[in-house]
């Protein structure tokens, strides 16, 4: 049995809770802020110690490149253990006009070259998040959400959906007679959508997250 110091156990438990809550491991800055470290460098030291003990794996160059190891009931996380040799070129989608496809050319502001190790599976585009409705899932205003195009999603997955003229990011929960779009922030209301509603269309699922300034 691997023995961790009290501080290392705190860091490990924080990583696990973050992955259970959102699917994303925390950044060094988030670990430092949560546990009261003086800087992200202090968090990095503890992460390296955990990696040496074989309980996590770190992906070089990825701010969220942390993977839990050797745990039978480890939560599913939206990251990969190793960087691939090739880079992905992903379009960044800004504001989406009503009634037009998300990937319409006029919505694409630029392209990013991304390390595939940042994502659980290959995304099709990055969507700039607006608002704080998913704050408690670690998704903040201005973040770039990596999205894989899908027309179906599993219960509990974080999705991108078109709702009337708007595009929204929420957690999907299936309910009798429809689905509920769950906000991860008590300041925002959940949205119930009746089965077969013409106002609702699933656009994709979240497969990763990039925070500007950490990219």
Curated annotation (Swiss-Prot):
Residues 28-48 bind DNA. CDD domains: S24_LexA-like. GO terms for biological process: DNA repair; DNA replication; negative regulation of DNA-templated transcription; proteolysis; SOS response. The keyword DNA-binding applies. It is an enzyme of class 3 (hydrolase). Pfam families: LexA_DNA_bind, Peptidase_S24. The active site is at 133 (for autocatalytic cleavage activity), 170 (for autocatalytic cleavage activity). GO terms for molecular function: DNA binding; serine-type endopeptidase activity. The keyword Magnesium does not apply. Represses a number of genes involved in the response to DNA damage (SOS response), including recA and lexA. In the presence of single-stranded DNA, RecA interacts with LexA causing an autocatalytic cleavage which disrupts the DNA-binding part of LexA, leading to derepression of the SOS regulon and eventually DNA repair. Homodimer. Belongs to the peptidase S24 family. This is LexA repressor.
């Amino acid at each position: 049995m691997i023995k961790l110091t009290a501080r290392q156990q705190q860091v490990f438990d924080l990583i696990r809770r973050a992955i259970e809550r959102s699917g994303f491991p925390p950044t060094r800055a988030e670990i430092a802020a949560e546990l009261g470290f003086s800087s992200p460098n202090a968090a990095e030291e503890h992460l390296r110690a955990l990696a040496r003990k074989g309980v996590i794996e770190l992906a070089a160059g990825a701010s969220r490149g942390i993977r839990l190891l050797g745990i039978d009931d480890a939560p599913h996380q939206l990251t990969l253990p190793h960087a691939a040799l090739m880079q992905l070129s992903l379009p960044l989608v800004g504001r989406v006009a009503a009634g037009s496809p998300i990937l319409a050319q006029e919505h694409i502001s630029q392209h990013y070259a991304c390390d595939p190790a940042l994502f659980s599976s290959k995304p099709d585009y990055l969507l700039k998040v607006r608002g704080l409705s998913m704050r408690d899932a670690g998704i903040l205003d201005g973040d770039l959400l990596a999205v894989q195009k899908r027309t179906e999603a599993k219960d509990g997955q974080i999705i991108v959906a078109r709702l009337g003229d708007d595009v929204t990011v929420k957690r999907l929960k299936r309910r009798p007679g429809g689905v509920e779009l769950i906000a991860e922030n008590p300041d925002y209301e959940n949205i119930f959508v009746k089965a077969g509603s013409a106002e609702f269309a699933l656009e994709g699922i979240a497969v990763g997250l990039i925070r500007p300034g950490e990219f």
